Swiss-Prot record:
Residue positions, PTM N6-acetyllysine: 384, 718, 954
GO biological process: amyloid fibril formation; mRNA transport; negative regulation of RNA export from nucleus; nuclear pore complex assembly; nucleocytoplasmic transport; protein import into nucleus; RNA export from nucleus; symbiont entry into host cell
Keywords: Acetylation, DNA-binding, Glycoprotein, Host-virus interaction, Isopeptide bond, Membrane, Metal-binding, mRNA transport, Nuclear pore complex, Nucleus, Phosphoprotein, Protein transport, Repeat, Translocation, Transport, Ubl conjugation, Viral penetration into host nucleus, Virus entry into host cell, Zinc, Zinc-finger
Listed Polar residues bias regions: 107-121, 181-190, 1321-1335, 1343-1356, 1363-1396, 1420-1431, 1438-1463
Biased composition (Gly residues): 1-15
Record comment regarding domains: Contains FG repeats. FG repeats are interaction sites for karyopherins (importins, exportins) and form probably an affinity gradient, guiding the transport proteins unidirectionally with their cargo through the NPC. FG repeat regions are highly flexible and lack ordered secondary structure. The overall conservation of FG repeats regarding exact sequence, spacing, and repeat unit length is limited. (Microbial infection) FG repeats mediates interaction with HIV-1 capsid protein p24 (CA).
RanBP2-type zinc finger locations on the chain: 657-687, 722-751, 793-822, 851-880
Protein name per its UniProtKB record: Nuclear pore complex protein Nup153
Ranges of compositional bias, category Low complexity: 1147-1157
Entry's disease: The variant p.Pro485Leu has been identified in a patient with spermatogenic failure. This patient also carried a homozygous loss-of-function variant affecting a splice site in the NUP210L gene, thought to be the cause of the disease. As NUP210L knockout male mice are fertile, it has been proposed that the increased phenotypic severity associated with NUP210L loss in the patient was due to the presence of the additional NUP153 variant. However, interspecies divergence in the nuclear pore function of NUP210L in round spermatids cannot be ruled out.
Main function: Component of the nuclear pore complex (NPC), a complex required for the trafficking across the nuclear envelope. Functions as a scaffolding element in the nuclear phase of the NPC essential for normal nucleocytoplasmic transport of proteins and mRNAs. Involved in the quality control and retention of unspliced mRNAs in the nucleus; in association with TPR, regulates the nuclear export of unspliced mRNA species bearing constitutive transport element (CTE) in a NXF1- and KHDRBS1-independent manner. Mediates TPR anchoring to the nuclear membrane at NPC.
Species whose genome carries this gene: Homo sapiens
């Protein structure tokens, strides 16, 4: 019916399914049978959905009457179909088709015979062809339709088709579309069916006329099919052209199948016949009446015009996820599964379930359900029930199915059971398939039938399989070598000693016979134990060593005399000479026969290779034990083991290996006995002994005789190394016996010079074995055994240090030169080792041995000579020496230790003792505590001088990524050494300190008291982002006394007094007043805050905030900034060290790379920072004379108003901020609130221009800096002093002072309008800098004109330079967008940003919030309040304010927990101002 419906609705589709049903009618037939049974029941079921229960009952009666007749035929056919799915399905199909379609090409006959099935199904198909098509199987599953459907496309289509072809083609054609549509929707299909029914019924008033019945059945089927999942072609649009389908149907009434015209659906003509039967007028009449009832409901539905209905149906036909889902399952299950899957499962289950469901579901529910739920419900369950409704029909189907199934089951138990389940029980199943039934409905007729067949087939295969098992010949599982020996490839030596081959053969034959009497006759082919045994007996004894399958190991042990051990199998041949062998062979074979188990043991012991290797195969070898030709004969009799094969005693392999030929051990080629060399590889023919040795058979050793002659012994022997070959212990290369050194690594042959263990013994003895000494054989056993190859040579010892296995002669480990555990030789015996090694050649390993007394540096692991007291690489003191060497983690906390450490990479040596600043030079100490604290700000009090070096091992404050540790001053003092490489750690002291901008590691917030301590306590070597915030006044900073050298404290600010931070990347060392001279030898990021001028020197991530001195100038001290109030420190290009002598203001910072030495003493002449790379010279004194000569990023800020005091001579990145507002020199991650010099990522919030501190957000409390600070070439920082700040080539520095003339401030834009733009100065935005000042400056190279700092945080617009974005309306420079902030900073004012990494601006600002910002990594200069942002041009401020990766932005460290995004800067500013 599904196909019928499909056919009606979907025309072609339906037909196709009909064929499917034909193809797979088998199980679908079951469904169809149910359908046939339920022709009435199907109609009733359909009607149940549509028609009241009484109608259903009436139909059930009719169905029972008709169904009984029809169904009986159909049902039996179903069972038959189960047996013959196709046939039966076809019959069913034909019946249905005939009943429905063929007999009554006019709808009436087709339907009437189908009764409900045909009538309802077919009309359902017509009205609901789509449903049935989609439901093909379901329709079929529906009692009538199911039968039609059993031939998925046929039965259903037939019922539907026959009927619907006529009627539907006639009337339902258009309506058929509607039906199909309705079918798709299910309910609507019913409605359409009803309409159609109404139209049809009205047009076909005759109650039982096929049309009326068809309409009814159609509507029913529609309902049922809608309930049942079936392949509804209409769902896929095939049915939608119901006209097409109907036309197809019209073309041939028989071709009701939606897929093809004609009842070919199931059985072709048979289907037509069946339909005629099904199409009994009585059934049809009830169906029609039911249809009328449906029509009534349809009329109720019919309230909608047929046109509306069609539209609705069309819509329903349209694919919708829900409709498709409903249809698709049916399609998948039905069409696809119907032929095959359904055959067994769905159909049976469908029928069973259908029947059950039919009984379960009251007809009234059917009436109720059909309307809204009909499609889904029908498809899933109801449809089936509708089909099944007639109990009689179901019963009939069950009966027939059961009968057929029973017959089937009897014939085919599995299939029968399944089918019975499917057919009889399958009804319940069928209900389940109901859901599946959609699928199964589609394939219902065909698919189910097929399934049954399939199942039957499956059952048969099972039986067949069972049959197969018995058929298998019984073979003794222990396939002994005797059986195999028939094909024994490795009995080459059989003929080796021909003397008793015959005897052995006979013996073997006897053995074989004895073993298995029949085996003699066919032992060759039988792998029966006897053959194997005989072979084994013969073969194994000769090569008892590895070849005995029973107990290879034992045999191996028996090597020389083990033949006895092998005796049961091997012993006869092994023990006995040929004659003995014959006798023994006989005896033994019986044993073997008795003990096929024996062979089993052998087999158990080894694999086929073992068998092949076993003496049985290489019996000649085994016989070699007998040394006499007899030994060969054992080989022969081994063949006899195959005895029927080789009465001659030569096995298949033997014939090849017979004494007439010998196998080359090198290339395994068979050579004639006359050949002395291998014809292929020219390898010399090995004597039997050699062969035996090669074979590894120990028996050969027994008889240095013919036994050895088994050159061609076992098959496995071919693969065995030549006797005497030895494996190099070093490179595992196999060497020839004559080689005394490894051909690969030239390692001496084991045992040559040494009491090498078995290996040598084996080899040498193997050579000796030629003599056939049994003892030597034993030795060889070590070589021979497979596991022995992996055994350590005797006396070998494993180095306890490096676990390398050493030869017995080695007194030291050849690898690590460690002494042999038992040897008394001291470590110095390395010389001894070479001595011993020479014997072995030791591969020249002596060359790699450590010289005596050499020692490895603990820090860098470099090997140093014994006379070296320091590591050549890192100059670390030799362990045990009291040199100044600081361990990787050790930081010299002694005051003397404070001495400068020359380029201590990560080591920051902070010594409380002020006097010895330079005393201990930690040469590039990697692991010194103070070294390389990326984000650590050391907030420890002065108590703990230990600089926090890049301490790998020290746990204190170890590398806390995002932790901000807030410790109180006392604790801080103690904890000074805690901060080790704390990435994001901000150690907050009790004093609230402004968050340090992107302190790579830590921002130290300390109270004033603590500040003092902090300077002492925290010399964070390379504290990347550490900012030391000292609430205390200058004194804390003043604590210069303790010279705190934080080597390369990248981000650390060393608060410790007098600590010199050589290349302390960022540590700022606050030196006590006592020791003004802090040497920041290239303190990379170290900022030493002087109390007033606390200049945070490019503290990479660290911000040092001192509340007292807003003056804090943070020069981008690449490494360390010494903030001494005394200006005396002159870094004279002291690359890593900047010495500040308290007495002398003139402390020269000779090119202190990043170190800024602010001298607090005003009286003293200003420290001259000679090219203090990153140093910022901040002088409190008016003198401010401290001129950082080319202090790279140093911001020289002099607290005194003296405008010119601090000449930042070429301060690379520093911006000079004169007057109190501290210039924040490029403290990398630091933001100096008081000074607006913008650190790298910082935005200067104060009006004062920020020197281009990388990330620093410098918030200048005081914008006006009276003294004109000359910032010579401040790389990144901008001079922030309002007074004319001359920035000499301030690279990124922005000269903030109006008067400031910035000379070539590379990236800096002078903030002060008056400042004539230096090269990179603000006026013309320098390379990356944008002028912080509002006055526009010609864009510097890469700078952003007017406050936009290219690198610095957002600054105000400056004429855009190459890459800069002018914050103002200025046209964007090359890559810049006009209002972009400096490189890392985002300037709030400008919305456009050119590739600002962190800026919020659209330009690829990673984190920066400010819309504008050129390539501002994280800086966000979005805070309007901070005038510094616009004014201060931060050169390359990665993250100014925005928390997003603000390296130094805001005092908030992005990494440091404390850093907050935008507000952070403001907060910092406030905090610093507070301080």
């Amino acid at each position: 019916m599904a196909s019928g419906a499909g056919g009606v609705g979907g025309g072609g589709g339906g037909k196709i399914r009909t064929r499917r049903c034909h193809q797979g009618p088998i199980k679908p037939y079951q469904q169809g049978r149910q359908q046939h049974q339920g022709i009435l029941s199907r109609v009733t079921e359909s009607v149940k959905n549509i028609v009241p229960g009484w109608l259903q009952r009436y139909f059930n009666k009719n169905e029972d009457v008709c169904s009984c007749s029809t169904d009986t035929s159909e049902v039996p056919r179903w069972p038959e179909n189960k047996e013959d799915h196709l046939v039966y399905a076809d019959e069913e199909s034909s019946n249905i088709t005939d009943g429905r379609i063929t007999p009554e090409p006019a709808v009436s006959n087709t339907e009437e015979p189908s009764t409900t099935s045909t009538a309802s199904n077919y009309p359902d198909v017509l009205t609901r062809p789509s449903l049935h098509r989609s439901h093909l199987n379901f329709s079929m599953l529906e009692s009538p339709a199911l039968h039609c459907q059993p031939s998925t496309s046929s039965a259903f289509p037939i019922g539907s088709s026959g009927f619907s072809l006529v009627k539907e083609i006639k009337d339902s054609t258009s309506q058929h579309d509607d039906d199909n549509i309705s079918t798709t929707s299910g309910f609507s299909s019913r409605a359409s069916d009803k309409d159609i029914t109404v139209s049809k019924n009205t047009s076909l008033p005759p109650l039982w006329s096929p049309e009326a019945e068809r309409s009814h059945s159609l509507s029913q089927h529609t309902a049922t099919s809608s309930k049942k999942p079936a392949f509804n072609l209409s769902a896929f649009g095939t049915l939608s052209p119901s006209l097409g389908n109907s036309s197809i149907l019209k073309t041939s009434q028989l071709g009701d199948s939606p897929f093809y015209p004609g009842k070919t659906t199931y059985g072709g003509a048979a289907a037509a016949v069946r339909q005629s039967k099904l199409r009994n007028t009585p059934y049809q009449a009830p169906v029609r009446r039911q249809m009328k009832a449906k029509q009534l409901s349809a009329q109720s539905y019919g309230v909608t015009s047929s046109t509306a209905r069609r539209i609705l149906q069309s819509l329903e036909k349209m694919s919708s996820p829900l409709a498709d889902a409903k249809r698709i399952p049916s399609i998948v299950s039905s069409p696809l599964n119907s032929p095959l899957d359904r055959s067994g499962i769905d159909i049976t289950d469908f029928q069973a379930k259908r029947e059950k469901v039919d009984s379960q579901y009251p007809p009234v529910q059917r009436l109720m359900t059909p309307k809204p739920v009909s499609i889904a419900t029908n498809r899933s369950v109801y449809f089936k029930p509708s089909l099944t409704p007639s109990g009689e029909f179901r019963k009939t189907n069950q009966r027939i199915d059961n009968k057929c199934s029973t017959g089937y089951e009897k014939n085919m138990t599995p299939g029968q059971n399944r089918e019975q389940r499917e057919s009889g029980f399958s009804y319940p199943n069928f209900s389940l398939p109901a859901a599946n039934g959609l699928s199964s409905g589609v394939g219902g007729g065909g698919g189910k039938m097929r399934r049954e067949r399939t199942r039957f087939v499956a059952s048969k295969p099972l039986e067949e399989e069972e049959m197969e098992v018995p058929v298998l010949p019984k073979i003794s599982l222990p396939i002994t070598s005797s059986s195999l020996p028939t094909f024994n490839f490795s009995s080459p030596e059989i003929t080796t000693s021909s003397p008793s081959p015959i005897n052995s053969s006979q013996a073997l034959t006897n053995k074989v016979q004895m073993t298995s009497p029949s085996s003699t006759g066919s032992p060759m082919f039988k792998f029966s134990s006897p053959i194997v045994k005989s072979t084994e007996a013969n073969v194994l004894p000769p090569s008892s060593i590895g070849f005995t399958f029973s107990v290879p190991v034992a045999k191996t042990a028996e090597l020389s005399g083990s033949s006895s051990t092998l005796e049961p199998i091997i012993s006869s041949s092994a023990h006995h000479v040929t004659t003995v062998n014959s006798t023994n062979c006989k005896k033994t074979p019986p044993e073997d026969c008795e003990g096929p188990f024996r062979p089993a043991e052998i087999l158990k012991e080894g694999s086929v290779l073992d068998i092949l290797k076993s003496p049985g195969f290489a019996s000649p070898k085994i016989d070699s034990v007998a040394a006499q030709p007899t030994a060969t004969s054992p080989v022969v009799y081994t063949r006899p083991a195959i005895s029927s094969f080789s009465s001659s005693g030569i096995g298949f392999g033997e014939s090849l290996k017979a004494g007439s030929s010998w196998q080359c051990d090198t290339c395994l080629l068979q050579n004639k006995v006359t050949d002395n060399k291998c014809i292929a590889c020219q390898a010399a023919k090995l004597s039997p002994r050699d062969t035996a040795k090669q074979t590894g058979i120990e028996t050969p050793n027994k008889s240095g005789k013919t036994t050895l002659s088994a050159s061609g012994t076992g098959f496995g022997d071919k693969f065995k190394p030549v006797i005497g070959t030895w494996d190099c212990d070093t490179c595992l290369v196999q060497n020839k016996p004559e080689a005394i050194k490894c051909v690969a690594c030239e390692t001496p042959k084991p045992g040559t010079c040494v009491k090498r263990a078995l290996t040598l013994t084996v080899v040498s003895e193997s050579a000796e074995t030629m003599t056939a000494s049994s003892s030597s054989c034993t030795v060889t056993t070590g070589t021979l055994g497979f596991g022995d190859k992996f055994k350590r040579p005797i006396g070998s010892w494993e180095c306890s240090v490096c676990c390398v296995s050493n030869n017995a002669e080695d007194n030291k480990c050849v690898s690590c030169m460690s002494e042999k555990p038992g040897s008394s030789v001291p470590a110095s015996s390395s010389s001894t080792v070479p001595v011993s090694l020479p014997s072995g050649g030791s591969l020249g390993l002596e060359k790699f041995k450590k010289p005596e007394g050499s020692w490895d540096c603990e820090l860098c692991l470099v090997q140093n000579k014994a006379d070296s007291t320091k590591c050549l690489a890192c100059e670390s003191a030799k362990p045990g020496t009291k040199s100044g060497f600081k361990g990787f983690d050790t930081s010299s906390s002694s005051s003397n230790s404070a001495a400068s450490s020359s380029f201590k990479f990560g080591v920051s040596s902070s010594s409380s003792g002020p006097s010895q600043t330079l005393t201990s030079t930690g040469n590039f100490k990697f692991g010194d505590q103070g070294g390389f604290k990326i984000g650590v700000s050391s907030d420890s009090g002065s108590i703990n001088p230990m600089s926090e070096g890049f301490k790998f091992s020290k746990p204190i404050g170890d590398f806390k990524f995002g932790v901000s540790s807030e410790s109180k001053p006392e604790e801080v003092k103690k904890d000074s050494k805690n901060d080790n490489f704390k990435f994001g750690l901000s150690s907050g002291l009790s004093n609230p300190v402004s968050l340090t901008p992107f302190q790579f590691g830590v921002s130290n917030l300390g109270q004033e008291e603590k500040k003092e301590e902090l300077p002492k306590s925290s010399s964070a070597g390379f504290s990347f982002g550490t900012g030391v915030i000292n609430s205390t006044p200058a004194p804390a900073n003043t604590i210069v006394t303790s010279e705190n050298k934080s080597s390369f404290n990248l981000g650390t600010i060393e608060t410790k007094s007098a600590s010199v931070a050589p290349f302390t990347c960022k540590t700022s060392e606050a030196k006590k007043e006592e020791m003004p001279a802090t040497k920041g030898g290239f303190s990379f990021g170290n900022v030493e805050p002087a109390s007033l001028p606390s200049a945070s020197v490019f503290v990479l991530g660290r911000t040092e905030e001192k509340q007292q001195e807003p003056v804090t100038s943070t020069s981008l001290v690449f490494g360390k900034k010494a903030d001494n109030e005394e200006p005396k420190c002159q870094p004279v290009f002291s690359f890593g060290n900047s010495e500040q002598t308290k007495d002398e203001n003139s402390s020269k910072s000779t090119f202190s790379f990043s170190m800024t030495k602010p001298s607090e003493k005003e009286s003293e002449q200003p420290a001259k920072a000679t090219f203090a790379f990153g140093a910022q010279t901040s002088t409190t004194a008016d003198q401010g004379a401290a001129k950082p000569v080319f202090s790279f990023l140093n911001n020289s800020s002099s607290s005194s108003s003296t405008p010119a005091t601090s000449a930042g001579g070429g301060i690379f990145g520093s911006s000079t901020s004169s007057s109190n507002p501290p210039v924040a020199t490029f403290v990398f991650g630091q933001s100096s609130n008081p000074v607006s010099s913008s650190a790298f990522g910082n935005t200067a919030e104060s009006s004062t221009s920020q020197s281009l501190l990388f990330s620093q957000d410098s918030k200048l409390a005081t914008t006006s800096s009276t003294g004109t600070a000359v910032t010579p070439f401040v790389f990144g920082p901008g001079a922030s002093s309002n007074n004319t700040t001359t920035s000499g080539f301030g690279f990124g520095a922005t000269t903030t002072s109006s008067s400031a003339g910035s000379s070539f401030v590379f990236g800096t834009g002078p903030s002060a309008p008056s400042a004539s733009p230096a090269f990179g100065a603000n006026q013309t935005p320098t390379f990356g800098q944008s002028q912080g000042a509002s006055q526009p400056n010609p864009p510097g190279f890469g700078s952003i004109s007017s406050s936009t700092a290219l690198f610095p945080t957002g600054s105000q617009p400056a004429p855009p330079t190459f890459g800069t974005v002018s914050s103002s309306s200025q046209p964007p420079v090359f890559g810049q967008q006009p209002s972009q902030s400096a490189f890392g900073s985002g300037t709030t004012p400008n919305s456009s940003s050119a590739f600002q990494f962190g800026s919020s601006t659209t330009n690829f600002n990673f984190t920066n919030n400010s819309p504008s910002g050129v390539f501002t990594f994280g800086a966000n200069s979005s805070t309007p309040a901070a005038s510094a942002q616009p004014s201060g041009s931060g050169g390359f401020p990665f993250n100014q304010s925005p928390a997003a990766f603000t390296v130094g932005s805001n005092g908030k460290n992005v990494f440091s927990s404390s850093g907050t995004s935008f507000s952070g800067r403001k907060i910092k500013t406030a905090v610093r101002r507070r301080k």
